[in-house]
Amino acid sequence: FLSDFQVIRLFRACGCVKTKGISVEFLFAYILGNAFRSSSFYMQQRMQELRGCFSKNTYYRFLANPHVNWLHFTTRLAVRIIEQFLKPLTSENRRECFVIDDSLYERAGYKRTELAARVFDHVSMRYKKGFRLLTLGWTDGASFLPVNSVLLSSTKDENILGKRCSFDHRTLSHKRQEMACEKATTV
């Protein structure tokens, strides 16, 4: 997967560069493989089953790197998968379209979660604590591929329950924070 779709090249184009220590390829392959394991990084470390030769600081610093544009990365990776893998399998008669889904993402420990808010759930017709997960996906009627997703908070300050961290206005983190407080129609 990593070599077929040139994932590491895409990753570097989206701002991820490591100068020393463990390579980006190894760390990203481990994180990607973690999605298919039965336990998280924390539980692997606690049970002494950790297969990586890096510290937890390296792992979490890599995921929280403010210079990596994850939104751009997932979009470019989805385009590459669609163009190289899914389109050749799709017949000319089949129509392709984008699907936008707005789901509730409940968060129990909301007090320490940045920008957690009271969000209205249209299914139960009640306010719940958490986020709205806005997902853009591509489909040809038989297969579905998520292209992008954004966690949205509330546009009203009185509905925001979690703390709001301050970031440098030039960073991607600040832009993501501003995007989270916008309406879903403008995102």
Regions found by a protein language model. Name each.
Residues 1-187:
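Conserved, well-structured functional cores that handle cations and Mg-NTP chemistry
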